[in-house]
Amino acid sequence: MALGGGTFTVPNKVLPGAYINFVSMARALGSMGERGIVALPLEMNWGPEDEVITIDAGEFQKEALNILGYSFADEEMKPLREVFKGAKLVKLYRINGAGGKKATATVGTEGLTITAKHPGTRGNDIKIVVQANIDDETKFDVITYIGTTKVDTQTVATIAELEPNNFVEFNGTGALEITAGVPLAGGENGTSTGENYSSFLDKIEAEDFTTLVYAGEDEVTKALFDSFTKRLRDDEGVKITTVLHDYVKADFEGVISVKNNPELVYWVAGQSAGANVNESLTNRKYDGEYEVNTKFKKREFEQAIQNGEFAFYQDGNDVRVLKDINTFTNFAPEKNQDFSSNRVIRVLDQIANDTARIFSDYYLGKVTNDDTGRELFKNELVNYHEQLLNIRAIENFNQEDIIVLPGVQKQDVIVNEVVQPTDSMEKLYMSIEVR
């Protein structure tokens, strides 16, 4: 066996032997990032305080009762059902948790105290039943109900053996006493204040999401969400979209203003987040549960488009999206009407977000900034744009449209590119010659 061996940086080894390096053949590493994530502050009767919880569509359908205190089909879950019509994932924040009170109850004379896991009025729907166990006369069945649904049963001999469940915590010592049912009481919701919304935005800024939504009518809070969106997009480079109701004053490509009912922002947020970069929401059928006010005249719909309003119209028995637009209306030569199209913005945002992610994951601090390194990065970008070309999100692309140059400092890389996003057909102008 040779004395020398291993890998090498330069051929300067002393001992005879084989020194072998294995390297990957150069290939693109990046791909399009995930869409479909909605950040949602919501007033709820149950749930953790001051915390962002992540729920996917499957969890929502199967575990809504355990997580949110209501079953999937309950009326209180309608906003989330609307969001999940399009979203894959929701970053949920209970906006009225702070300042609430937990429901409590005491069972028997030995001091079994039950406290709801979370503050809120839903805790008042919890009931505890203690009954004799039919198989062991020394033990009891302690049953937790929420509404009429049995959610937990524990068979124990003493209070100390009881474990917390998804809805209540048990405290006390000694023997249990049989009771047909003791309801918890005193649960109260907190209030949703401007401070609560600021706290939510502070926390959600650290999360990855596609679309932010606020369903309220408070103008100060709308302005807060508008400013947050503009700061993230323009100062931080995080290309999110925010959906509000009746807020065309934003005049910004990152803010969508819904014209019809305020509660439709939930559906719009889910659809906007879940739409692929090669999809438009124009003429999409509304498949949600709310009654939609579409009683507008033709000229009002025309004005809505000019104002930058996202509107719904009646098409026979269906309700559909009039035009997939945002609030940007202050067109200029360097920023024209294309920027008012949400499909175009989805493409541009995807390019910006994915380019930043690819550079950070695979090139930042890892690849030398010389001609070879910059050529690798260019090839990466070319491959990425070809993915967009293949799904018809962009058109007329060739590799000469991307130029990668050294910057002023040795660490700087400059990229100049030309891109042509596509959009969906919306207007048909047809001339027919009749002979």
Q: Model-derived features: where do they sit?
A:
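A glycine- and small-residue-enriched flexible loop/hinge signal that marks low-structured segments
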Residues: 2-22, 32-47, 53, 66-67, ...
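Cofactor-binding catalytic cores of oxidoreductases
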Residues: 57
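Soluble or luminal CAZymes and related metallo-dependent hydrolases
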Residues: 72
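Hydrophobic alpha-helical segments
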Residues: 384-391, 420-424
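C-terminal edge-of-domain segments
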Residues: 403-435
